[in-house]
Amino acid sequence: MNSGPGKKPDWLKIKLTSGSSFASTKKLLNKHSLHTVCRSAMCPNLHECWSKGTATFLLLGNVCTRSCRFCAVGTERRPAMPDPEETAKIGEAVKAMKLRHAVLTSVNRDDLADGGAAHWVETIRAIREVNPGVSIECLIPDFQGDEQALDSVMRERPEVLNHNIETVPSRYASVRPQASYERSLAVIERAKRQFRLATKSGMMVGMGETPEEVNAALRDLRAHGCDMVTIGQYLQPTATHLPVSRYVTPEEFERYREIALDAGFRHVQSGPFVRSSYHAEAFEPVEEISNS
C-alpha cells in the first residue's frame, strides 16, 4: 500500500517575492476583473511571475465543466456565460503590462456549442489589434476533438500552440477521466501537420507514473510533432484532490530534461516548479520551429 510521499522536501519550499511589479500586476488584473490561471489554479509560481510583471490569462471564466483530479479550478456543469468584454480587457491588459509574449489559456467549456473557440479567436485578434508585434502562446483545451473549433483557433496562427497531455496514459482514468490521451496527441499533431505551428505540451509527475512511462510519453509527443515540452512536480492543491504519489528529485528532473532533448525537443523546461507557462518567454524565438 502506498504510504504517501512523506514530508515535503526542501527543494519544494517556495520563496515568496513581491514588490511594485507584483502590486501593479495584481491591481491591473483586479481593475479589469480578469482571471488568471496563476490565481485560479493556485500556481506555486504566482509570486515570482507577478513580481516580474507577467501572468497567464484565463479565458471563458474561472469555472470549468470538467473535474480533473489534479486541478484547483472550480467546476460546474453549466457555468455562467462568457463575459463578452473579456476579449477587449485582455488586449488592453497586455498593452498596460507591456508584454512581449502573451500567454492565454482557458477552462474547458463543454457546455458551449463550440467549446468557446469563437471567444478564443476574438481574444487573439483583440490582443493583436492593440499590441502589434506581440507574440501569443495559446494553451488550448481539446474542444472535445471538434476539428472545426480547433481549426478556427489554429487559423489565427498563434506563435505557440500549447496543449497539455498532463500525465501518462495509464493515469488518465484516475487523473483526468473526461479527457483522452489519444485525443490530446491528435490536437498537437493537427497543429503541426496541418498548420505548421510551433507546438508545445506539458505533463506533471508524481502522480503514480513510472519513469519508463514518462519516457514513452515524451516519445509519443515527438512522434506527433511536438516541439517543446514542460515537466513539473504535481502538488496537491487541496485535501480533496488527488494525493501526491511521490516527490520527484531535481536530479530526476534533469534526467527527464536530457531524455527530452535527446528525443529531439527544441526546448525543454523540467523542474519541480515548472508549469505550462513558466518562463514561457524562454521558448522564443519560434520562427525556426514553426517552419520545421
Curated annotation (Swiss-Prot):
Query: What are the UniProt keywords, alphabetically?
Result: 4Fe-4S, Cytoplasm, Iron, Iron-sulfur, Metal-binding, S-adenosyl-L-methionine, Transferase
Q: Where in the cell is it found?
A: Cytoplasm
Q: List the disulfide bonds.
A: none
* Pathway(s) where this gene product acts: Protein modification; protein lipoylation via endogenous pathway; protein N(6)-(lipoyl)lysine from octanoyl-[acyl-carrier-protein]: step 2/2
Q: How is the cofactor bound?
A: Binds 2 [4Fe-4S] clusters per subunit. One cluster is coordinated with 3 cysteines and an exchangeable S-adenosyl-L-methionine.
Offer an example of a GO molecular function term for this protein. metal ion binding
Q: Which cofactor does it need?
A: [4Fe-4S] cluster
Q: Which residues bind [4Fe-4S] cluster 1?
A: C38, C43, C49, S277
**Which E.C. number(s) belong to this protein?**
2.8.1.8
Does the record carry Disulfide bond as a key word?
Answer: no
Q: Does the keyword section mention Iron-sulfur?
A: yes
Q: Which PANTHER family match?
A: LIPOYL SYNTHASE, LIPOYL SYNTHASE, MITOCHONDRIAL
| Protein name per its UniProtKB record | Lipoyl synthase
**Native organism:** Chlorobaculum parvum (strain DSM 263 / NCIMB 8327) (Chlorobium vibrioforme subsp. thiosulfatophilum)
Per the record, the gene is lipA
